[in-house]
Amino acid sequence: MRVIHLITRLIVGGAQENTVASVLGLRRKPGLDVTLVAGLTTGPEGSLESLVASEPGLLTRLPALVRPIHPWLDWRAVRELTALFRKRRPDIVHTHSGKAGILGRLAARRAGVPTIIHTIHGPSFGPFQGPLANGAFRCAERYAGRFTTHFVVVANAMAD
């Protein structure tokens, strides 16, 4: 079974550390071909790249996948992810984080991936963002939720 995990950045943080641990653990299970796709690591938080660098073929970088809303790069990321998913033909695409979750689920649907999973590590929207970004994320999450086959939450508070 071929599984692709997708996260926006490999920075030091809970969602990223959880994703890397899951990918490395699943990669050792017989019958699973597990890989990770991420945007470029930037930010003062620090990087988790060293944890995956020693695993050949594990990480694919997608420079168009960036954290801020950027219509041109976001559309480019969807196109590149769609092409990647069509080429690799995964059985499962498992997305993590708000931006990768929305763009990755859309690309997986466009590529005909049969199982699309999204883990909610924390809110993608809320009072911590401006009203425009907040509204955009809410609409995008509602839309992506329509073709997400499974949701995983890391805490019961995220289920709502």
Report each predicted region and the residues it spans.
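Nucleotide-sugar donor phosphate/pyrophosphate-binding loop at the beta->alpha transition
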Residues: 72-79, 114-117, 124-147
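Glycine-rich phosphate-binding loop signature in dinucleotide/nucleotide-binding domains
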Residues: 84-91
